[in-house]
């Protein structure tokens, strides 16, 4: 097969490309330029997508003896990932930019261009697994190394995208083995630290970065009863579950710390309360999609057992889910995912993503529109 290897400049994508070459595929490496000012992106142990990473990707391709190209996706990244991040925070939601990048850049724009150029598949260094059944249908599953598993951030992939996706690290038992293999292959990135945080926020100060992009206006911090307990410099920079950065003039009666329970951007208010009120057991999601073909219960609206995960490395919890049709404010009917959790989760914020699993299989995902406690009816 003709395979396009997405080279991030890290050890995982380098070893994934090496395995694709070793498997006999015709492999071409490509690095995505996601900014026309890469010096503003994070570097070293906490970054990705920088000039340094581009050079590391080139060196890896040189060792592997495969062609290397750089594709400029900076405008699309700015529009589909960076601007989306700003818009979501402005609306009082908490987005996941890495998931959005996978959805709109790596497995949309990149895959579309690859197929147009005659490639059969895109190969990445993600820790996830694609399984094909007897009918040729593709399913997305967790990787062998659950500690490094990245199936959560790939839950947005469609069946058609999975048909053209390769994850050579799927059965690798540990990251240590990947690094050891890179060392044996003479890849200079063998001991390169993993990237973390948000690549387009150079100093990691999300609140400060957002303050330059969003009109921040001081407003009230209120408790769960509506009483004013402090002021904030701008509601949009907060997220549900946050404790740090709250300047409360009125302490809680019990003396215990308070956490952000809700963001109300239209009122420019931040609602705070005790940690216990962060526990939610019902999630309602929009923008529902299925990884592979949806299970039969989706079409009938029947409930089905699953596990729900709301963070990339969070613990999945038992849940019961169903899909129902709802009519939005504009009169358009759309699908809504309703997930009832057996074990409550804390700090679930609108804008985050809930991904559903059955065993190791990823069923699908939705963007969280609302989260509440069925017992307290707080949020």
Swiss-Prot record:
GO cellular component, one term: cytoplasm
InterPro entries hit by this protein: MnmA-like, MnmA-like_C, MnmA-like_central, MnmA-like_central_sf, Rossmann-like_a/b/a_fold
Residue segments, region Interaction with tRNA: 148-150
EC number: 2.8.1.13
Site description Interaction with tRNA, residues in chain: 126, 352
Keywords assigned by UniProt, alphabetized: ATP-binding, Cytoplasm, Disulfide bond, Nucleotide-binding, RNA-binding, Transferase, tRNA processing, tRNA-binding
Catalytic activity: S-sulfanyl-L-cysteinyl-[protein] + uridine(34) in tRNA + AH2 + ATP = 2-thiouridine(34) in tRNA + L-cysteinyl-[protein] + A + AMP + diphosphate + H(+)
Keyword ATP-binding: yes
Residues at the active site: 101, 199
Secreted in keyword set: no
Compartments (UniProt record): Cytoplasm
Gene Ontology biological process terms from the UniProt entry: tRNA wobble position uridine thiolation
Major subcellular site: cytoplasm
UniProt: ATP binding residues: 6-13, 32, 125
GO terms for MF: ATP binding; tRNA binding; tRNA-uridine 2-sulfurtransferase activity
CDD domains: MnmA_TRMU-like
Cystine pairings recorded for this chain: 101-199
Function: Catalyzes the 2-thiolation of uridine at the wobble position (U34) of tRNA, leading to the formation of s(2)U34.
Similarity comment: Belongs to the MnmA/TRMU family.
Protein name: tRNA-specific 2-thiouridylase MnmA
Organism for this UniProt entry: Paenarthrobacter aurescens (strain TC1)
């Amino acid at each position: 097969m003709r395979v396009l290897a997405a080279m991030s400049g890290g050890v995982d994508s380098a070893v994934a490309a090496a395995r694709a070459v070793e498997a006999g595929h015709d492999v071409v490496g490509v690095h995505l330029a996601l900014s026309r000012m890469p010096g503003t992106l994070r570097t070293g142990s906490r970054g990705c997508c920088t000039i340094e990473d581009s050079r590391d990707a080139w060196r890896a391709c040189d060792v592997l003896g495969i062609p290397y190209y750089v594709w400029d996706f900076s405008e699309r990244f700015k529009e589909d990932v960076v601007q989306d991040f700003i818009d979501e925070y402005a609306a009082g939601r908490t987005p996941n930019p890495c998931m959005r990048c996978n959805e709109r850049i790596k497995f949309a724009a990149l895959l579309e261009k690859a197929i147009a150029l005659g490639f059969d598949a895109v190969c990445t260094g993600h820790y996830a697994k694609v399984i094909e059944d007897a009918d040729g249908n593709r399913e997305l599953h967790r990787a062998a190394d659950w500690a490094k598993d990245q199936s959560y951030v790939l839950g947005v992939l469609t069946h058609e995208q999975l048909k053209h996706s390769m994850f050579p690290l799927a059965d690798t038992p540990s990251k240590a083995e990947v690094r050891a293999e890179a060392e044996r292959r003479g890849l200079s990135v063998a001991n390169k630290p993993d990237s973390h945080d948000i690549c387009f926020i150079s100093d990691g100060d999300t609140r400060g970065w957002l303050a330059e992009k969003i009109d921040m206006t001081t407003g009230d911090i209120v408790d769960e009863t509506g009483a004013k307990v402090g002021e904030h410099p701008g509601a949009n920079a907060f997220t549900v579950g946050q404790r740090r950065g709250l300047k409360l003039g009125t302490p809680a009666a019990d003396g215990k710390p308070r956490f952000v329970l809700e963001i109300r951007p239209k009122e420019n208010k931040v609602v705070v309360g005790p940690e216990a009120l962060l526990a939610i057991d019902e999630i309602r999601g929009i923008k529902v999609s299925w990884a592979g073909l949806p299970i039969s219960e989706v079409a009938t609206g029947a409930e089905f057992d699953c596990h729900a995960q709301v963070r990339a490395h969070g613990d999945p919890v038992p849940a019961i889910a169903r899909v129902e049709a709802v009519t939005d404010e504009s009169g358009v009917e759309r699908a809504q995912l309703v997930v009832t959790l057996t074990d409550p989760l804390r700090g679930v914020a609108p804008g985050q993503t809930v991904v559903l699993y059955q065993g190791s299989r990823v069923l699908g995902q939705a963007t969280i529109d609302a989260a509440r406690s069925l017992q307290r009816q707080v949020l």
